[in-house]
Amino acid sequence: MNRAEKRGFKLYCNTQKGEKIYIVLFDIIDNLATEDSKKIQNRFEIENTGKSIEIAAGYLYKLLLNFLVQKRVEKSIQAKIFRQIEISKILFDSKLYDDALEELAIGKKMAEKYEDDIMQMLICRIEMLQLESLGFVGVSEKELVTKHMKLQAMMKYSRTINQHISLLDILNHRLLYKHYHTIEEEKEMLIDLVLSELHIISNSNYIGFQAEKIHLLFQSAYYIEVGNYISAVRNYKHLIELFKENFHLIQNPPIYYLNAIVGVLESLFAAEIYGEMEHFIGILHGMRQEKYSVDFLLKVSWLEYYYTMMILFQTGNWHKIDEVENSFKECLLKHISCLPLDIQLEYYLLKALILFGKGHLKEAQKNLKPVFSSGKIFQRLPLFRLIRIINLLIIVEMGGDDFVDVEIAALKRNYTGQNLSKTERLILRFIQDYPLPRYSKMKIKIANFYTNKIKIIRKDKLERRVLKYFDFLTFIESKLTGVSFQNLLRNKKMAL
């Protein structure tokens, strides 16, 4: 909750009768700013001897939900449409039939304006039930048939949209949890979804905002995954224009609009076109100034922070990193634990990579400790594998090679169903070569081996998934040539 919502909740509580112990609990939770329930309970028992925290928490939970639901009605279009439906039902039960149908018609216009197919179908069904209860007075057979035809058309459209969304969800799931050796293999495994999506588009008679939005999201996600970043950027820019043309259809918070911005940034970042990313990062910064929910604003802050930091890191501009870090300390970094687990894991990885790149090995290893000490909560996430590899790299850089071979064998065994990428296999081989040889002949031999491997991997677009977080190939080059990792990153940026 933001400050205005907290203030509004306390005003709402003032309208309630009885003893308000739950407000004391609310203040304790707000002031302590901790997720440790024991600390909260101890403070509550100190300030309210003999009072039950369970009862206070239960009542606080109930009041918070009631308050937030009321606030949601003020912002949510769907809640406003539901309100019109309830008004219509009340009027109809009060035998004010004409007024009831008028209120329902207002809700219907709102649903049509915002292209909410579910609400449109619900309103049509309620309208049919009301007309049936009235014996279809004043409604001709032709008008009745027309109304039913509209309802059937809406049901067909809704079914098409749901089929389209299901394809997009399956695509995203495959991209998250399936791994392929080559672009050709990936294209082959995704071809069924691509053909199904094209079939839906070609056989749909309705072309509107929702259908176009889902089509562009699907195509863009596919293009990013197969390495066609130019087409992905083009589609995402088209999607952003579509949102601007239909601004009233953007959700509050604008989740799909945010996805489009992130899609452009991800495509440009993967293609290493860093110069054009500044404009879209600026859009994220502008979104932070709007009055959206706290969770949404926290996610937007994270995205602005993440892409800004990654650009600085990947281009070797490390002297600006601390300044950016300080600017996000209050609005984001103190609240990392409030973000989803995948973002928390991404934060730990980003922080460790920066420390590792700067040579602060002990700090980098310490930064990853929460990940490994949290049990299995992070282990199911795809990024956990990369963190294990980075941790191994930190260990050998610190001069410790105990159990490294055992850990590498365990890592390969754990991911037998998820093929390691070429980059991951190469960096694991490189880790096993520690300590690196000092004699010139062996140095030349090992350098030639890795140089040839690096040339092959750089041509493979599929490897950008791993390299976008940390340029392992440039790191290997820095260790073999003696040139600092930071300088090689800077030189690479100048060559782009």
Regions found by a protein language model. Give the residues of each.
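Alpha-helical linker/edge segments of TPR/alpha-solenoid repeat scaffolds
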Residues: 128-144, 150-158, 168-176, 263-273, ...
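Amphipathic alpha-helical segments of tetratricopeptide repeats
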Residues: 105-113, 146-156, 192-204, 237-249, ...
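"A position-specific structural signal for the A-helix of alpha-solenoid helical repeats
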Residues: 82, 86-90, 119-122, 126, ...
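Flexible inter-repeat linkers and adjacent short helices
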Residues: 1-192, 204-206, 413, 429-430, ...
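Helix-turn-helix repeat elements of alpha-solenoid scaffolds
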Residues: 58-62, 95-105, 136-148, 180-199, ...
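Active-site/pore-lining binding-face segments in mid-to-C-terminal subdomains
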Residues: 373-441
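Alpha-solenoid helical-repeat scaffolds
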Residues: 138-142, 159-276
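Alpha-solenoid helical repeat architecture
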Residues: 115-122, 158-165, 203-213, 247-259, ...
